[in-house]
Curated annotation (Swiss-Prot):
<keyword id="KW-0210">Decarboxylase</keyword>
<comment type="similarity">
    <text>Belongs to the uroporphyrinogen decarboxylase family.</text>
</comment>
<dbReference type="InterPro" id="IPR038071">
    <property type="entry name" value="UROD/MetE-like_sf"/>
</dbReference>
<feature type="binding site">
    <location>
        <position position="210"/>
    </location>
    <ligand>
        <name>substrate</name>
    </ligand>
</feature>
<dbReference type="InterPro" id="IPR000257">
    <property type="entry name" value="Uroporphyrinogen_deCOase"/>
</dbReference>
<keyword id="KW-0456">Lyase</keyword>
<feature type="binding site">
    <location>
        <position position="328"/>
    </location>
    <ligand>
        <name>substrate</name>
    </ligand>
</feature>
<protein>
    <recommendedName>
        <fullName>Uroporphyrinogen decarboxylase</fullName>
        <ecNumber>4.1.1.37</ecNumber>
    </recommendedName>
</protein>
<dbReference type="Pfam" id="PF01208">
    <property type="entry name" value="URO-D"/>
</dbReference>
<keyword id="KW-0963">Cytoplasm</keyword>
<dbReference type="InterPro" id="IPR006361">
    <property type="entry name" value="Uroporphyrinogen_deCO2ase_HemE"/>
</dbReference>
<feature type="binding site">
    <location>
        <position position="155"/>
    </location>
    <ligand>
        <name>substrate</name>
    </ligand>
</feature>
<comment type="subunit">
    <text>Homodimer.</text>
</comment>
<feature type="site" description="Transition state stabilizer">
    <location>
        <position position="78"/>
    </location>
</feature>
<dbReference type="GO" id="GO:0004853">
    <property type="term" value="F:uroporphyrinogen decarboxylase activity"/>
</dbReference>
<comment type="function">
    <text>Catalyzes the decarboxylation of four acetate groups of uroporphyrinogen-III to yield coproporphyrinogen-III.</text>
</comment>
<feature type="binding site">
    <location>
        <begin position="27"/>
        <end position="31"/>
    </location>
    <ligand>
        <name>substrate</name>
    </ligand>
</feature>
Length: 355
């Protein structure tokens, strides 16, 4: 494989020295970019875009072509590819987000679910990873990703997005045996899926536990964290002669960082409700930290964006082990110039904290 020209993202995750704080952005290939909207229109719809390796590659690279400051690319895909490959029948309803034609509601439903083979059942994702790695040609590392078992389970049990997770939590408390069976099958599926991405060329992976923060502290430990630990334990950790770092991101998980730091991931993602300085004091000896600017800051003027970047950099302090990111994904209404101001500010203002 081609040598990396810019490896500061991987170095920061491994707590090795860097010249400036690396930066990337969740949903950096997305609807705020006019070029993304044009490619999506060409594809026809969101899933057609995900399932076309050439177009998925095109949108993955668009933010890198626009913003030379970006230190990583992230695979363009969706967390719900796994349940779709399990036969749940994913589709997107305008204005309502993702929906499933089949809903999981019993142990019998769960026992009937297959564990997808990454190359046979999710080959379009593996092909996209290979295509992106080839086209990147060592420019920056490529991040692969998956949803966490708990997060995927909520969609499968609810039949789509949910505000209160009523059905998922009812199963969790009323029929924990069924929920554990589903989570165990999903942990196997995610492990296999991420290992497929790593073999295809992903140089780091992130587990998105988007709905872990909806759980009580006890339920988080039993129904989310334990399954993410199983995944981390089963991942390929060395590939192409390099360590493959793992980032664990539980939105709303700021109270549980100490437990998360024990799972074996190299880094924890933080949402914007955490103070990154306090997080570093709590777990910074054990893990790198990624985050954690409020995505809404990008609606503000460039001077305000710069001030918030400066505040977060100062809160983290000197030294490596910080990957700058938003605390969640960029929203579609953001002016692309404001994203550019954000990336520029991170590199310009962080140099003083290194070296």
């Amino acid at each position: 494989m081609t040598a990396l020209k810019n490896d500061r993202f991987l170095r920061a995750l491994l707590k090795q020295p860097v010249d400036v704080t690396p930066v990337w952005m969740m949903r950096q290939a997305g609807r705020y970019l006019p070029e993304y909207r044009a490619t999506r229109a060409k594809a026809g719809d969101f899933m057609s875009l995900c399932m076309n390796p050439e177009l998925a590659c095109e949108v993955t690279l668009q933010p890198l072509d626009r913003y030379p400051q970006l230190d990583a690319a992230i695979l363009f895909s969706d967390i719900l590819t796994i349940p779709d490959a399990m036969g749940q029948g994913l589709y997107f309803e305008t204005g309502e987000g993702p929906r499933f034609r089949k809903v999981v509601s019993s142990l019998a439903d769960i026992e009937a679910l297959p564990v997808p083979d990454p190359e046979q059942d999710l080959g379009y994702v593996m092909d996209a990873v290979r295509t992106i790695r080839r086209e990147l040609n060592g420019r920056v590392p490529l991040i692969g990703f998956s949803g966490s078992p708990w997060t995927l389970a909520t969609y499968m049990v609810e039949g789509g997005s949910s505000k209160d997770f009523r059905k998922s939590k009812a199963m969790l408390y009323d029929n924990p045996k069924a929920m554990h069976a589903l989570l165990d099958k999903l942990a196997q599926s995610v492990t296999s899926y991420l290992n497929g991405q790593i073999r295809a060329g992903a140089q780091a992976v992130q587990i998105f536990d988007s709905w872990g923060g909806s759980l009580s502290a006890a339920a988080y430990q039993e129904f989310s964290l334990v399954y993410m630990r199983k995944i981390v334990d089963g991942l390929i950790r060395e590939h192409d002669g390099r360590r493959v770092p793992v980032i664990l991101f539980t939105k709303g998980g700021g109270l549980w960082l100490e437990s998360m730091a024990e799972v074996g991931a190299e880094a924890l993602g933080l949402d914007w409700t955490c103070d990154i300085g306090s997080a570093r004091a709590r777990v910074g000896e054990r893990v790198a930290l990624q985050g954690n600017m409020d995505p809404s800051v990008l609606y503000a003027n460039p001077a305000a964006i710069r001030a918030e970047v400066a505040r977060i950099l100062a809160a983290y302090g000197k030294g490596t082990g910080h990957v700058f990111n938003l605390g969640h994904g960029i929203t579609p209404e953001v002016d692309p110039a404001h994203a550019g101001a954000f990336f520029e500010a991170v590199h310009e203002l962080s140099a003083q904290y290194h070296g």
